[in-house]
From Swiss-Prot:
Species classification: Eukaryota, Viridiplantae, Streptophyta, Embryophyta, Tracheophyta
Ranges for region Disordered: 158-179, 255-339, 353-381, 710-748
PROSITE patterns: G_AIG1 (PS51720)
Stated induction or repression of this protein's expression: By light conditions.
Membrane topology type: Single-pass membrane protein
Annotated binding of GTP, by residue: 466-471, 485-490, 583, 631-632
Chain positions covered by the region annotation Homodimerization: 485-488, 548-553
Free-text comment on the cofactor: Binds 1 Mg(2+) ion by subunit.
Biased composition regions of type Basic and acidic residues, renumbered to the chain: 300-312
Record-annotated disulphide pairs: none
Residues carrying N-acetylglycine: 2
Protein name: Translocase of chloroplast 120, chloroplastic
């Protein structure tokens, strides 16, 4: 044969069945080894598809052999990394003359009963042992040793000698584990072979250098050949029967997979030799020539250079040799998939690296490989720890007498598997064997009773006084830990109780009872702060909040207590909280109409009330705290084992402990998988509902009158009377020049004709209007004179000024009745306005009832009470107070308003106000301030701001306003502002134009045009409305309203009211007849038939 090296992959059809000499040792692997094989297969099968070298036209097939002494057949597993390591090996060389190389590579397969398995884990890749063969004159001998070491796994480093007789070339290749410091080429290949052929005869080609570096954990073997046809190299011989190799090739135990640390028992060595005279060697004629004599990596290496590779070379008898003449079995399939089942979960393809002249470019930094290696190690370690958590939880449930089919147990195991999938690399699926193996291991450990259970749980008990906290603790430990008394407080200080329940260490923190009343929250804060100081060094794992099942309440009576707990400990206290309902053996109350209610329905309703209250207190409506029932009474029904049983057949103590242990197990899994940031409340715990910024902004943009002194209450706000004083003087003189007028009686009016009656009524209306204008004008003049006189008497003696103030501000000494309230229309025969009459007394407080206009009770329709008063501070600063409280059977609403104004300078005044009102189930507190500038007669400007506290969110707003007064009939108000909260901003503006009657307010004509714009979250809302009131005669009005927005929604309404034209009521018959006609339409008749 000529010089050079050639890799040949033996085809299944060309292999000859050779007689097998030697003996085959049997090794039965442990359960852990089996599981690891399945795991490696699942992770490796994805990369088998589409990764075949271009130069190799055939595939390596694998055979199944019958077991020698065991009927159980283990599925053959072979990873794609092995195939790359065996099939894709190429040696590039410069072909000179007739130089040929022959290397026989074997595809090594295994059977569980026929082989020894040692899987090494180095650089996050599982490299198996490679059996090295010495090929000489067609004979091959392979040997394989099984290494057993609990601390270090040794790598079988074999040397492969290829004797080429015809040429003078001697090449060797060594199998080993490549260290992370090697180049990408060494990592990509399992077996690295490089050869350089030198022809010293006729071709006259210069000598070339050949290097091979293999790092085997402890040392590196370097061989250099400079112009030599033969070389000296280091090789490690594997001695049959040895249990350890040279120290220079030992692999640290830390790189060994945890499942493989259970060493298999060595029973012998496997030797297979070829007895036939030679092997059929088929040379590969598609070898690519490379001038630089470098290693050429196949396309599959190029495509999967960055993929995670886990190769496992399985030791077995050679597929070309057999002790018997039995026919070869077809390729084995994975367990559970069947013969025709396709391979699942292909590995994701990565972007191909750029190539230069057909070779892979190795310019990627080595840090990427190191990071991938670290992630794989961390992933495998995390899976083992998570499996240990599964085993621990199954042991806990087993001790509590719960099967894996229990709802709580199944749910916890499902969450653990789901978390592992989310955390696992590339979203790898968790095999079903994880649960089976964990369950079997848990049962085995519990049956052996030798391995102690490393688990303890700390439970802190909170609850109202008298719900049974101390009694529950005694029931958990089945002994009297704390003395209880039905008439005295059991626990007066925080104390720690420890004990064992079914061999599990349980620590319970007992706390003093809390009080639900709002007035007792200060005392509760002291108790809870002492509890917080007690648990600072050793925080509890679970919080058990106890309440009574038989104390049902649908109101928010416990909300002050729950909010106090949240304020002291923070909202996170409820994330690992369990709700316990004591007195669970109580009979459910009667249902509606005296019928018996279901026990399960009663428990569900009571649980929902407490869970909803906890959600509101924590500020997270996604919380769903588990509920457990508790019964501590000695007369409670028990089962044969002496455990207390509830009316629904549940044994409450194991269920409560299982919930507590499950919560801690899930917390441990969260900490292991680093999912702490994903728990509820970590990001949204303190975030409550966002404030309604558009509503707050619209309230801010509303124009409010400023508080005034008592003598200024009836003054016109804008002093528009000064705008047209000439017209007022003319109307006043006109009234004085009117001739005398005699009023007619009803009898005299009946004698008048229709035209005469109309003229008489018109004259009467004209005279009344002029008289009312004169009265209003005189009242304004009197107010101005009093204001001027008050300014002049400031320098006078105190006694005189006090008399003037009393005359000015003292109310009437005789109470006078206030006008009757206008009650809504009803079908009652009586109009009980007399029930709502009250007197205007000399008291400064004005207290009035609040009438529910839409209520069903017209006799006594009181809904609340309203109180108002005007204070004067230092005779200059008015302070107005108004409050209203309304109460019905379910809710109570409070509305409070406090306002004041101060004048500073000419034409400038500042108002300050405080509002408190209900907003849903919370109270909204608003502080607002506004400054007005009245320097111009027809133009007035204002600027204001407000701050609103709603729940735990604070909103701040700013507005500007401008009022333009053209004359007495036309005015326009423009305002704009913005409201912000939590980084969210809403913008808005309003425009209102008003056109009044010439004789307003005596004239009834009024038209108003409004336009509003609101921008919130990029959503622009534009709305317009118009309202007009037109008088029709003396006693009729026409009111029309219309509104439209930018979304096409609008409304139009027309209303006519009259006190004389009763025939207008006939219009109400139109919709009635229209409805009746629809009942007798042909469509309805046909449908009826």
């Amino acid at each position: 044969m000529g010089d050079g090296a050639e890799i040949v992959t033996r085809l299944y059809g060309d292999e000859k069945k050779l007689a097998e000499d030697g003996r085959i040792s049997e090794l039965v692997g442990s359960d852990e080894v089996k599981d690891n094989e399945e795991e490696v297969f699942e992770e490796a099968i994805g990369s088998q598809e589409g990764l075949k070298p271009e130069s190799l036209k055939t595939d390596v097939l694998q055979e199944d052999f019958p077991l020698a002494s065991n009927d159980e057949v283990c599925d053959l597993e072979e990873t794609s990394r092995n195939e790359r390591g065996v099939e894709n090996l190429k040696v590039n060389y410069s072909e000179i003359g007739e130089s040929h190389g022959e290397v026989n590579e074997q595809c090594i397969t295994t059977k569980e009963a026929d082989s020894d398995l040692v899987t090494l884990k180095m650089n996050d890749y599982d490299h198996g042992e490679v059996a090295d063969a010495d090929i000489s004159y067609g004979k091959m001998a392979s040997s394989l040793d099984v290494v057993e070491n609990s601390e270090k796994a040794t790598s079988n480093l074999a040397t492969e000698d290829v004797n080429l007789e015809n040429g003078n070339t001697h090449s060797s290749s060594e199998n080993g584990v490549v260290s992370p410091d090697e180049n990408k080429e060494l990592v990509a290949e399992v077996i690295s072979v490089s050869a350089c052929s030198v022809e010293t005869g006729s071709n006259g080609i210069d000598d070339e250098k050949w290097e091979e570096e293999i790092d085997v954990s402890a040392g590196m073997v370097t061989e250099q050949r400079n112009g030599k046809t033969g070389a000296e190299f280091n090789s490690v011989k594997i001695v049959s029967g040895d249990k350890s190799l040279n120290d220079s090739i030992e692999v640290a135990a830390g790189t060994l997979s945890p499942l493989e640390k259970s060493s298999s028992e060595e029973k012998g060595e496997t030797e297979s030799q070829n007895s036939n005279g030679g092997h059929d060697i088929q040379s590969n004629k598609e070898i690519v020539k490379q001038q630089d004599s470098s290693v050429n990596i196949g396309p599959e290496i190029k495509e999967s250079q960055h993929m995670e590779r886990e190769s496992e070379v399985l030791s077995s008898v050679s597929p070309t040799e057999s002790r018997s003449d039995t026919a070869a079995l077809p390729p084995a399939r994975p367990a559970g998939l069947g013969r025709a089942a396709p391979l699942l979960e292909p590995a994701p393809r990565v972007t191909q690296q750029p190539r230069v002249n057909g070779n892979v470019s190795h310019n990627q930094p080595q840090q990427a490989e190191d990071s991938t290696t670290a992630e794989t190690d961390e992933h495998d370690e995390t899976r083992e720890k998570l499996q240990f958590i599964r085993v621990k939880f199954l042991r806990l449930s087993h001790r509590l007498g719960q099967t894996p089919h229990n709802v709580v147990v199944a749910q916890v195991l499902y969450r653990l598997g789901l978390a592992e999938q989310l955390r696992g690399r590339n979203g790898s699926r968790v095999g079903a064997f994880s649960f089976d193996r964990a369950s079997a291991m848990a049962e085995q450990l519990e049956a052996a009773a030798q391995d102690p259970l490393d688990f303890s749980c700390t439970i802190m008990v909170l609850g109202k006084s008298g719900v049974g906290k101390s009694a529950t603790i005694n029931s958990i430990f089945d002994e009297l830990k704390i003395s209880t008394d039905a008439f005295q407080v059991g626990t007066k200080k925080v104390q720690d109780i420890e004990g064992f329940v079914q061999g599990i260490k349980v620590r319970v923190i007992d706390t003093p009872g809390l009080l639900p009343s709002w007035s007792d929250q200060h005392k509760n804060e002291k108790i809870l702060k002492s509890v917080r100081a007690f648990i600072k060094k050793s925080p509890p794992d679970i919080v058990l909040y106890l309440d009574r099942l038989d104390m049902q309440s649908r109101d928010s009576g416990d909300m002050p207590l729950l909010r106090t707990i949240t304020d002291v400990f923070g909202p996170s206290i409820w994330f690992n909280a369990i709700v316990g309902l004591t007195h669970a053996a109580s009979a459910p109350p009667d249902g509606p109409n005296g019928t018996a209610s279901s026990y399960d329905m009663f428990v569900t309703q009571r649980s929902h009330v407490i869970q909803q209250a906890i959600r509101q207190a924590a500020g997270d409506m996604r919380l769903m705290n588990p509920v457990s029932l508790v019964e501590n009474h000695s007369a409670c029904r028990t089962n044969r084992a002496g455990q207390r049983v509830l009316p629904n057949g549940q044994v409450w103590k194991p269920h409560l402990l299982l919930l507590s242990f499950a919560s801690k197990i899930l917390a441990e899994a969260n900490a292991l998988l680093k999912l702490q940031d994903n728990i509820p409340g970590g990001q949204f715990a303190t975030r409550s509902k966002a404030p309604p910024l558009p509503l707050l902004l619209s309230s801010l943009l509303q124009s409010r009158p400023q508080a005034k002194l008592p003598e200024q209450q009836y003054d016109d706000e804008d002093d528009e009377d000064d705008l047209d004083e000439s017209s007022d003087s003319e109307e006043e003189s006109e009234y004085d020049e009117l001739p005398p007028f005699k009023r007619l009686t009803k009898a005299e009016m009946t004698k008048l004709s229709k035209s005469q009656k109309k003229e008489y009524l018109d004259e009467m209306e004209y005279r009344e209007k002029l008289f009312m204008k004169r009265q209003m004008k005189e009242e304004r003049k009197r107010r101005k004179l009093l204001k001027k006189f008050a300014a002049e008497i400031k320098d006078m003696p105190n006694g005189y000024s006090e008399n003037v103030e009393e005359e000015r501000s003292e109310p009437a000494s005789v109470p006078v009745p206030m006008p009757d309230l206008s009650l809504p229309a009803s079908f009652d025969s009586d109009n009980p306005t007399h029930r709502y009459r009250y007197l205007d007394t000399s008291n400064q407080w004005l207290v009035r009832p609040v009438l529910e206009t839409h209520g069903w009770d017209h006799d006594i329709g009181y809904e609340g009470v309203n109180a108002e008063r005007l204070f004067v501070v230092k005779d200059k600063i008015p302070v107005s107070f108004s409050g209203q409280v309304t109460k019905d059977k379910k809710d109570a609403h409070v509305q409070l308003e406090l306002a004041s104004s101060v004048k500073h300078g000419e034409g400038r005044s500042t108002s300050l106000g405080f509002d408190m009102q209900n907003a849903g189930k919370e109270l909204a507190y608003t502080i607002r301030s506004e400054t007005r500038f009245n320097k111009f007669r027809k133009n007035k400007a204002a600027a204001g701001l407000s701050v609103t506290l709603l729940g735990d969110s604070v909103s701040a707003g700013l507005k500007v306003e401008d009022k333009l007064i053209a004359n007495k009939r036309f005015r326009m108000v423009m305002s704009g502002g913005a409201m912000t909260s939590r980084g969210d901003v809403a913008y808005g503006g309003t425009l209102e134009a008003q056109f009044r009657d010439k004789d307003y307010p005596l004239g009834r004509f009024l038209s108003t045009l409004g336009l509003s714009v609101m921008d919130w979250h990029g959503d622009l809302a534009i709305g317009g409305n118009i309202q007009s009131q037109v008088p029709i005669g003396r006693s009729s009005n026409l009111i029309a309203r219309a509104n439209l927005n930018n979304r096409g929604a609008g409304q139009v309404s027309i209303r006519v009211n009259s006190s004389e034209q009763l025939q207008l009521a006939v219009v109400a018959l139109v919709p009635l007849f229209k409805k009746l006609l629809t009942y007798y339409s042909p469509e309805q008749m046909q449908y009826g038939h």
